[in-house]
Amino acid sequence: MRQNTIALVYDFDGTLTPKTMQEYTIIPRLKLNSNKFWADILNEANATDGEIMMIYMRQLISHAESVGIKITKDEFTFMADKIKYFSGVKDWFKNINGYIKKNHKNIKIAHYVISAGHHEILEATSIRNNLTNVFGSQYYFDKHGNATFPKIVVTDTTKTQFLFRINKGKEKFSE
């Protein structure tokens, strides 16, 4: 079967932004010392042979509770505005889409982000309207809208699953 769609897939942290999304958002919000926080995560992962992203997401909830902050979707949406992008990122999508439209009329471009970062933040970023879909780690939110545990965890190794999903057109987790 001949296809005419090119999927451009980006990581987020360090690819579209100079720092991780957490450095712009949740870490300052919780007033954490970034170096100490990440060192504690790595120490726990090494001591327990645990998955770093699971430990990180659980620790965020614990830290938030200890300072009286509820992690909610609204909180993540608010924090997304604080993200800074590399120079040219915001123009990139318009420029590449325009180039393809002008020079290759039978080709379509689809832009995706696959990130270990927070899906809820990715959904609220200023570049989201340029993206076909975003994949990231997600929390389960209880009936009060509070994050209670990691629902979906994206790691460096699970990112390949999302490439497969994009290729097969199965972008929902229930598929």
Short names for language-model regions:
Residues 1-147:
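Alpha-helical substrate-recognition element adjacent to the catalytic core
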Residues 134-175:
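Conserved acidic, metal-coordinating active-site core of Asp-based
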